[in-house]
Structures are given as structure tokens and as C-alpha cells.
UniProtKB/Swiss-Prot annotation:
Disulfide bonds: none annotated. Trans-enoyl reductase; part of the gene cluster that mediates the biosynthesis of oxopyrrolidines, polyketide-amino acid hybrid compounds with feature structures of tetramic acid. The polyketide chain is first assembled by the highly reducing PKS module of opdA using acetyl-CoA as the starter unit and five malonyl-CoA as the extender units. OpdC acts as a trans-acting enoyl reductase and reduces the terminal alkenyl to alkane. The 17R in oxopyrrolidine A and 15R, 17S in oxopyrrolidine B are generated by non-stereospecific catalysis of the ketoreductase (KR) domain and enoyl reductases. Pathway: Secondary metabolite biosynthesis. One of its GO terms (molecular function) is oxidoreductase activity, acting on NAD(P)H. It is an enzyme of class 1 (oxidoreductase). It holds the Pfam family ADH_N. Monomer. This is Trans-enoyl reductase opdC. Disruption phenotype: Impairs the production of oxopyrrolidines A and B.
Length: 367
């Protein structure tokens, strides 16, 4: 690491709802099982605003999603064709981390476990790659982790028994979100049949991604329409909106026999109206295997099994990425680097960004 700078710029959490750009901060300490990445681009997610609003860690580096190139390897990471200095990668990190305030995506350098970083295929730019990591981490956790839907991780090309077709439907509520863009494609590749909800202007795009059917969530009969379409046998729902209304529609859609409901945020307990449904909300930061020490309800004990599950999932999704077939969510490239990310966080907080992600080049993102 002798050729690297001794300090960097980083967006630091200052107080509740406030991040500031600071200079002169040391690069993150590199763990033995980690790689150090020079950040090329970062992308914004709802939790970039939500986390600093609800559980700020003053002095911590903010940011979850990045793309860049490896500049150093931890002492326990074997240099290989896959992970070597100069390799283009993208990843998801635990920004605003009270236990590791020197590390987050919104900086010039970021450290990430070697087993939880994804190689970027030659056909994909840094800009495109930066839109993926949080959605990919959430997808694997939601669909295949035993704490959540617990679906079997089927290989691409797996055949679904047509006589049991209705039991393989999975409802993806909130099809217009970035996470749903990924989930729908992965479900289809895994042999399941995704159906989704959105505004009508998204219907064509979602069907091109692999959704078998799309439903207008504005319709007062949306829940019953979903149940009818799946012959009263829908057993799996993942809620990418996680509101009172979305939970109610998901519960209406799930068949009489019940099933599993996964929310991406804490769900309203008064909407858990059916004992036959097992509700759970996931927090993707558990994939790192360490305790999450944010304020309640965002505090979680360490889950080493989530780390193991995520590592298996990352190996699978990297192989899918390598095919060049995974479609990214629509995005808008912004200018101004890290300093402009502050305004972007405000726009996300205020609900001004819908249907696309904001991506910020930190340096040259042309390749």
C-alpha cells in the first residue's frame, strides 16, 4: 500500500439527517480478509438517507454502494485471476457503522470482504455496476436465506413442474423499485414465476424483465386479483415498499393456506392479521456476520450464518453477472462527485427520486 495516499475525502455523518464532506481522513484499515478498492462511482439507496435520519453514527463514513478497482489485498486474500490489484469490482458495505467509522462507500477508498465483492464483467461500466450491489445483497437475503423466504437456490435453466405451477409464484410488491428489478430477473432465472405490482407505465418494462403478470396497486381489487390469478395458492411475497397499504395487499394476495411475507422495513404489527402467514423483515447488513448497533428496531445480533449464506449467494450471482444478461435499474448520472451526493441524499429523503437511481462518478467511470 506504499503507493497509496495517506488521506482521502469522505462523506461523514455529522448529526441526525446531516452528512458533510471532509478531507484529510485516513484510508480505512484493511482487514486480513478484505480488499481495498479505489472508488470510481457510487449510487444512492433509500437507506443512505434513512440510516442517518434514524440512527446516525457521528464521524462514520456514509454510503452503501460502490464500483471501482482493487488497489490492495488483505494478508489473508490470495492474489488470483479473480481478485488481483487492478480488477474492476463492485460491492455493498455497511456505511454509517458505529463499530467501523472509517469505512463506507461515500469516500475515495473503501474496504470490503473479499468474499462479498463482485467482479464486474467487461460488458458493464462502473456506472452500471454501482447500481447493483445493495439490490443484489437484498435479493439473496430475501429469497434464499432461511430466515426469510427460504426458497431453494435453483440453477439457471431449472424446470418448474407445470402441474404445480401456481405454488411456484412469488409476488414482488413494488415492481418499480431498484430491488424489484433484480428480484424479478433472479426469480425467473431460478425457475420461479414472478408476478408484481406497479403503476401501469412500468408494466412493459417489468414483463421484459421476466414478470409473468403485473397488477396496478392503485386498484381496490389488487389483492383479490392477485389471489385469483394464483388460484388461491400464492405462498411467497416480498414487499419492496413496506407500507401499511402494501402489507395489506400482500396479505390479501396470499392464499388460504398461508405462507411467508418478507418486508424490507419493520412492518406494522396491526397489519399482521393472519396467523397462517409468517411475517419477517430483513436487514441486509446482517450479511457481514457482525452485530448491528443502530437504534431499535434496527439493532441486530451477529448472524454468522447470514454471512455464510451471503457468500454462497455472491458466488452464484457473480456467475450470472458474467453472462452479461442481468439488466440494471434505470439510472441518472450526476456530476459534482462526493459533494453532490449530499444533495442527492436530500432528494431521496424527500421522495423526489422514483423509478431510477442516482449515480455519481468519483473519478473516471468511462470503463
Amino acid at each position: 500500500m506504499g503507493d497509496l495516499p495517506t488521506s482521502q475525502q469522505a462523506l461523514k455523518v455529522a448529526s441526525s439527517g446531516r452528512v458533510i464532506l471532509e478531507t484529510g481522513h485516513p484510508l480505512p484499515e484493511l482487514g486480513a480478509d478484505e480488499v481495498l478498492v479505489r472508488v470510481a462511482c457510487v449510487a444512492l439507496n433509500p437507506y443512505d438517507a434513512k440510516s442517518v435520519d434514524m440512527s446516525p453514527s457521528p464521524g462514520a463514513t456514509a454510503g452503501l454502494d460502490f464500483a471501482g478497482e482493487i488497489v490492495a489485498l488483505g494478508e489473508a486474500v490470495n492474489s488470483s485471476t479473480r481478485l488481483a490489484v487492478g480488477k474492476r469490482v463492485c460491492g455493498f458495505v455497511f456505511g454509517n457503522n458505529p463499530d467501523r467509522r472509517d469505512n463506507g462507500a461515500f469516500a475515495e477508498y473503501v474496504a470490503v470482504p473479499a468474499s462479498l465483492v463482485l467482479c464486474i464483467p467487461d460488458s458493464m461500466t462502473f456506472l452500471e455496476a454501482a447500481t447493483l450491489p445493495c439490490g443484489l445483497a437484498t435479493t439473496g437475503t430475501a429469497l434464499y436465506n432461511s430466515h426469510n423466504l427460504g426458497l431453494p437456490l435453483l440453477r439457471p435453466g431449472s424446470e418448474v413442474n407445470s402441474s404445480n405451477k401456481s405454488s411456484t409464484y412469488v409476488l414482488v410488491y413494488g415492481g418499480g423499485t431498484a430491488t424489484a428489478t433484480i428480484i424479478i430477473q433472479v426469480l425467473r432465472r431460478s425457475g420461479f414465476i414472478p408476478i408484481t405490482t406497479s403503476s401501469p407505465h412500468n408494466f412493459n418494462r417489468l414483463q421484459q424483465l421476466g414478470a409473468e403478470a403485473t397488477f396496478d396497486y392503485h386498484s381496490p381489487t389488487c389483492g383479490s386479483d392477485l389471489r385469483d390469478y394464483t388460484h388461491n395458492r400464492l405462498a411467497f411475497a416480498i414487499d419492496c415498499i413496506s407500507s401499511t397499504d402494501s402489507m395489506q395487499i400482500c396479505y390479501e394476495a396470499i392464499g388460504t393456506a398461508g405462507g411467508r411475507y418478507v418486508s424490507l422495513d419493520p412492518f406494522p404489527l396491526n397489519k399482521h392479521t393472519r396467523r397462517s402467514i409468517r411475517p419477517v423483515w430483513l436487514f441486509s447488513f446482517t450479511i457481514f456476520g457482525s452485530a448491528i448497533k443502530w437504534d431499535t428496531p434496527y439493532n441486530f445480533p451477529a448472524r454468522p450464518d447470514d454471512r455464510e449464506s451471503a457468500e454462497r449467494w455472491y458466488a452464484e450471482i457473480e456467475a450470472i453477472l458474467a453472462t452479461g444478461e442481468l439488466v440494471t435499474h434505470p439510472f441518472q448520472e450526476e456530476t459534482g462527485g462526493l459533494s453532490s451526493v449530499i444533495d442527492g441524499i436530500g432528494a431521496v429523503r424527500n421522495g423526489q427520486i422514483t423509478g431510477y437511481k442516482l449515480v455519481y462518478p468519483i473519478r473516471n467511470c468511462a470503463y
